[in-house]
Amino acid sequence: MSGMWVHPGRTLIWALWVLAAVIKGPAADAPVRSTRLGWVRGKQTTVLGSTVPVNMFLGIPYAAPPLGPLRFKQPKPALPGNDFRNATSYPKLCFQDLEWLVSYQHVLKVRYPKLEASEDCLYLNIYAPAHADNGSNLPVMVWFPGGAFKMGSASSFDGSALAAYEDVLIVTTQYRLGIFGFFDTGDEHARGNWALLDQVAALTWVRDNIEFFGGDPRSVTIFGESAGAISVSSLILSPIANGLFHKAIMESGVAILPLLMRPPGDERKKDLQVLARICGCHASDSAALLQCLRAKPSEELMDISKKLTFSIPVIDDFFFPDEPVALLTQKAFNSVPSIIGVNNHECAFLLSTEFSEILGGSNRSLALYLVHTFLNIPTQYLHLVADHYFYNKHSPVEIRDSFLDLLGDVLFVVPGVVTARYHRDAGAPVYFYEFQHPPQCLNDTRPAFVKADHSDEIRFVFGGAFLKGDIVMFEGATEEEKLLSRKMMRYWANFARTGDPNGEGVPLWPAYTQSEQYLKLDLSVSVGQKLKEQEVEFWMNTIVP
């Protein structure tokens, strides 16, 4: 720990704590680390099938609480503490609709710790092999959770299995959500994108402190799913995140996803006027509105956010200097090795709740109406969409299946493939996958026609079948599913180590070159080429010329 900054008086605190640990006994086994902000004590766990213990450090603050005048503001660094921090319990969730969280646990057959929500929520959890200490220089994988920027937390994911099996450090993060994470006034008073700036703050903390837990700050891989993957893709595009990470994995989400960015101008002004009226601020300008909103209770703002959309990023000329497509076209982004992937039935169930009326079957007119209203496809293009997706489809089931495929193509497959091409053409190594295996444990909770739905791959990536703590990610996995999980853990960790997912014990994963080969992740892994070539061609050259 040579060269490490230690706050005056900490040596005495440390000595007293060690003495107490010796007297009490069990605390002597607790892992202890020093950071630039103070000492932390974690706890130890094990996972199924591995003899490697894992140190867990939970609820470590990476920024100051965004309360009072710091609400709707770029996060400030966390302050050093003189006391020993007990990092053994999960942090509170960022404000979100807790009913959604309960519902998702039932639908996905997962279980999370029961936690309260708070605006004081800028914390992260660290999972490290027990042998890791300052100087170990293990690869670091920083996870950004998904949830449409409206829900999610660091404590819905357990990195113990990945840490134990693959000898890497896992950091799970959480960031402000909804109105707390994205409110903006469209001017200098509140630029917005607070959630994305929280992520930059988390990565800055990792850069400055992860070495004390055994991680290598020069080998940081950021990864996420859905909104977490959009976050990863956005961080690649942002100049203020340059140098904070070195590899990136995007699972089912990229920054050019349609409908992602809030339109500027009159629509934003209208939203602000409605917001002022609902909350009783009656503000005459954005500075006054901001002052009024900062005085409102958290619960009141949470209720307001259910009536208005404040959960999407904006072009703020700071985090996003330009539109994502423009930045990709100009090659004005951080060109790092990347894995990009999708599931083969992204919109079949979890994301189709808005279209529940068609899950039993649909007709052509209803399907085209939904394409027009939900995806904002102009009416003059609808006949082209109909010819491509619904030609010679007559039964309600056929039309439903084509409609769900269309949604997945527009929202995930085409943006993912296009982003992979931009990254490839910028000279960075790219690897693409399509996840194809529906978890068998979900057979009785969703329709039989559903294949690999949105988020299905997460339990495999995290080795959920091998966890035995209070975060349950994969109950009832078959032996074949456990083998697939081990392969995916190895691919992801190999990539974190070297920027290449290939290595001993896993089938070859070809790079995404001009031939556009990709990996089909199923119980039997294989290689495909030009994923959905005709659909990508249709949307890129016919609808978006």
UniProtKB/Swiss-Prot annotation:
The entry's keywords: Disulfide bond, Glycoprotein, Hydrolase, Secreted, Serine esterase, Signal
The protein's Enzyme Commission number: 3.1.1.1
Misc. remarks from the entry: Protein specifically present in urine of cat. Present at high level in urine of members of the genus Felis and Lynx but not in urine of other felines.
Reaction catalyzed: a carboxylic ester + H2O = an alcohol + a carboxylate + H(+)
Cystine pairs: 94-121, 281-292
Span of the signal peptide: 1-28
UniProt record similarity statement: Belongs to the type-B carboxylesterase/lipase family.
SUPFAM superfamilies xref list: alpha/beta-Hydrolases (SSF53474)
Protein name, UniProt field: Carboxylesterase 5A
Function: Carboxylesterase present at high level in urine that regulates production of felinine, a probable pheromone precursor. Probably acts by hydrolyzing the peptide bond of the felinine precursor 3-methylbutanol cyteinylglycine, producing felinine and glycine in cat urine.
Coiled-coil boundaries: none
Induction comment: Strongly down-regulated in cats suffering from tubulointerstitial nephritis (TIN). Excretion decreases immediately after castration.
Glycosylation sites: 86, 134, 363, 443
Localization terms from the record: Secreted
Family annotation (InterPro entries): AB_hydrolase_fold, CarbesteraseB, Carboxylesterase_B_AS, Carboxylesterase_B_CS, Type-B_Carboxylest/Lipase
Enzyme class: hydrolase
Active site: 226 (acyl-ester intermediate), 346 (charge relay system), 454 (charge relay system)
